[in-house]
Structures are given as structure tokens and as C-alpha cells.
UniProtKB/Swiss-Prot annotation:
K(+) binds at E44. The gene is metK. The lineage of its organism: Bacteria, Bacillati, Actinomycetota, Actinomycetes, Mycobacteriales. Transmembrane segments: none annotated. Keywords: ATP-binding, Cytoplasm, Magnesium, Metal-binding, Nucleotide-binding, One-carbon metabolism, Potassium, Transferase. Belongs to the AdoMet synthase family. This is S-adenosylmethionine synthase. ATP binds at H16, D178, G179, K180, K249, F250, D258, R264, K265, A281, K285. It is an enzyme of class 2 (transferase). One of its GO terms (cellular component) is cytoplasm. Homotetramer; dimer of dimers. It comes from Mycobacterium sp. (strain KMS). Its cofactor is Mg(2+); K(+).
């Protein structure tokens, strides 16, 4: 990485149209898992002016929750803050269309009875559950922040959460739910040295003065508050460019301003572009889908490797074949920051972590309604909620294994 490089990451608030869709999909998932932890769920949502469309495939015994999906959708929209057409959407009056079928039996056979059991005669119960699809998933951790996340995305998420907080608690009661944040950081090598630019766009009520009210309020109540809590050793935050609503007024927002879809913010959901991404979205998918559960497991692996002091930053990749339990590949990259032989790190990972889908679900206790809170502000590095894949409970075992 060259000296003086600028790297940028973005986040969005829970009122962004795509994030409304993620929230609805995960709220439906949680409602079904709460009644039937073995529910198979793949739910996609689309929102546009005055309408919500929820489609996908579900196999579940949670009949009450399934029958109540429309109310689940409305409740989540209202919880986000869209309760009036003046804000661009109203969860009470919008149209809600449900088009959900059953999971394909061709897929189910490979998940319910993995290749290892069907063909190879394996007797281990954890060989019974196969991967719900082929695919590759990445996990990453770095010593940039206490939560071991890249600094640009961590800061962008904190700004987005604070933007929502001042709206909901009435500190800036003229704000509306839709909003985006973007952070550009200057690096010396891989060390963040200076905050260069913060871009913040937020929906607001009609008649708010951009220069006289919105910009100073955002600087004082959002940006300065977040930076005062950041306390980063190497990054200078004393002189940065702040751009608030660079287009001018932002009154028309939410689904009235832009249509939204589940799964369109996968870089926001992960590492802000700093690490690679396998391409699979998370929201609306139960943990039999390795797009979600294995990406969580890879973050768990990466964070524990760094927490164990085996490397200052690490990226791990896992890959699966549909219907097979065992991964078909594992790749570990330590970028020259390792403190022991990388081959020993990879071997330790395979000894300490069982990466079969059934084991991931067991070890991270994923058959629970824990997903709706992850739908906005990132799935990784969260400091506001307790997520099992963020724990560093395997660090000592990794140290012993190497």
C-alpha cells in the first residue's frame, strides 16, 4: 500500500430503502425461528412507493408466525420510523404483498442428508447436514480498532448509528429515517494516519436550512460526538472535510425516493471493501445457508486468530459444495503480519474450528431469532449488540494448537 493512500468505506441507516428490505427479511426470519428453530427460510423483499413485496421459499411448522407475516412487515417498517406519508412511507397504510412458496425438495435432500451420509456412509451426526449451496465465504480481522475491524467501515457504522440515535431520541427531531455515511481515511502503509473526509447525507423535514441548521447540528451532535469517543492512537481527526447533504435538500427519501431490495448492501454488511467478499448476501436466510452461517464462522475464525496474537491482520476463505458437509477448501492469508508459520496457523484453525455447517450452527447457536438487529450497521464488529461470532473464545485454543 503506497504512502498517502486514501481508502473509503460507507454505511447506511436502517431507513435506507435497501436496509428496510434487509430488516423486513430478517424480521420474517426471526419470527419463524422463534416458533420453529428448524425453519428453512429464504425471503427476499422489495419496497417501492407505497408497496412492499415479500417473496421466497419457506418450509416451517411455525404456522402462526407464517400467517402473521404481514403484521411482522408492518411492525418493522414502523419501528424503523416510517409512520407517515410525509416521510415517504407509512407502515400502517402501505400495501403488503406476500408471495412465498416451499423450499425446493431437490435442495432440501442435500441439506437434510449430506453426501457424506448418503453416499459415503458416514456415521457422524454432524455429517448429516450438507451445505445449502456451493459458494465461497471470507472472514477478516485487523488490529485497527478494539473490535478488530478496518477503521473506515467501523467509523462509518458509528456515524450511521449515531445519526439514527439523534433522530429517534429527539435530539434532532427534524431528521427522517433515510441516510448514508461515508468515511475517507489517509493511510501510511496500512496504518490509518488522518481522517480526510466525512460525507453524511440525511433525509430531513421540509424547510430545514442546510447551512444554518443541518450542517452545524450534524457536526456537533453526530460527527464530533462519534469522534470524541473514537480515541484512535494513530489517526489525526483535527482537520477533515465534512460534506453534509452535498446535493442540497433531502426531503424525498425512503422507498418514495428509491426502490429497495434485500441483499444490495453486502459491502456495507461486511468489511467496507477492505477485505474480499464471496458475493452472497445474508438477510432473509436461515443458517442452513452457508452464505450466511459460514461468513459468520469465518469472521469468528479471523477474529480469534488476531486476538490470539498469531497475526495483526488475517483473511480466511472457506468454500463448500452443495449437499456436502465438509468444506472443499480453506485459505488463510496473513499479509506478512504473522508471528508464527502461516502453515501452522492454518493447521490450528482446522484443529480448533469444525467448519461443517451443522457444527457451525451448533457452536454459534444460530437456530435463534438473533438476526433482525444485524440488518443495519453491519454484521461484524458490532459494539452495541452481543453476537456469538464476535467472541474471542477460541483464542487460547489457537495459541495452544500452534
Amino acid at each position: 500500500m503506497s504512502k498517502g493512500r486514501l481508502f473509503t468505506s460507507e454505511s447506511v441507516t436502517e431507513g435506507h430503502p435497501d436496509k428496510i428490505c434487509d430488516a423486513i427479511s430478517d424480521s420474517v426470519l426471526d419470527s419463524l425461528l422463534a416458533q420453529d428453530p428448524r425453519s428453512r427460510v429464504a425471503v427476499e423483499t422489495l419496497v417501492t412507493t407505497g408497496q412492499v413485496h415479500v417473496v421466497g421459499e419457506v418450509t416451517t411448522s411455525a404456522k402462526e408466525a407464517f400467517a402473521d407475516i404481514t403484521n411482522t412487515v408492518r411492525h418493522r417498517i414502523l419501528e424503523v420510523g416510517y409512520d407517515s406519508s410525509d416521510k415517504g412511507f407509512d407502515g400502517t397504510t402501505c400495501g403488503v404483498n406476500i408471495g412465498i412458496g416451499a423450499q425446493s425438495p431437490d435442495i432440501a435432500q442435500g441439506v437434510d442428508t449430506a453426501h457424506e451420509t448418503r453416499v459415503e456412509g458416514a456415521g457422524d451426526p454432524l455429517d448429516l447436514q450438507g451445505a445449502g449451496d456451493q459458494g465461497l465465504m471470507f472472514g477478516y480481522a485487523i488490529k485497527d480498532t478494539p473490535e478488530l475491524m478496518p477503521l473506515p467501515i467501523a467509523l462509518a457504522h458509528r456515524l450511521a448509528r449515531r445519526l439514527t440515535e439523534v433522530r429517534k431520541n429527539g435530539v434532532l427531531d427534524y431528521l427522517r429515517p433515510d441516510g448514508k455515511t461515508q468515511v475517507t481515511v489517509q493511510y501510511d502503509g496500512v496504518t490509518p494516519v488522518r481522517l480526510d473526509t466525512v460525507v453524511l447525507s440525511t433525509q430531513h423535514a421540509e424547510g430545514i436550512d442546510l447551512e444554518g441548521t443541518l450542517t452545524p447540528d450534524i457536526r456537533e451532535k453526530v460527527v464530533n460526538t462519534v469522534l470524541s469517543d473514537l480515541n484512535h492512537d494513530s489517526m489525526d481527526t483535527s482537520d477533515f472535510r465534512l460534506l453534509v447533504n452535498p446535493t442540497g435538500k433531502f426531503v424525498l427519501g425512503g422507498p418514495m425516493g428509491d426502490a429497495g431490495l434485500t441483499g444490495r448492501k453486502i459491502i456495507v454488511d461486511t468489511y467496507g471493501g477492505w477485505a474480499r467478499h464471496g458475493g452472497g448476501a445474508f438477510s432473509g436466510k436461515d443458517p442452513s445457508k452457508v452464505d450466511r452461517s459460514a461468513a459468520y464462522a469465518m469472521r469468528w475464525v479471523a477474529k480469534n486468530v488476531v486476538a490470539a496474537g498469531l497475526a495483526d491482520r488475517v483473511e480466511v476463505q472457506v468454500a463448500y459444495a452443495i449437499g456436502k458437509a465438509a468444506p472443499v477448501g480453506l485459505f488463510v492469508e496473513t499479509f506478512g503480519t504473522e508471528t508464527v508459520d502461516p502453515a501452522k496457523i492454518e493447521k490450528a484453525i482446522t484443529e480448533v474450528f469444525d467448519l461443517r455447517p451443522g457444527a457451525i450452527v451448533r457452536d454459534l447457536d444460530l437456530l435463534r431469532p438473533i438476526y433482525a438487529p444485524t440488518a443495519a450497521y453491519g454484521h461484524f464488529g458490532r459494539t452495541d449488540i452481543d453476537l456469538p461470532w464476535e467472541r474471542t473464545d477460541k483464542a487460547d485454543a489457537l495459541k495452544t494448537a500452534v
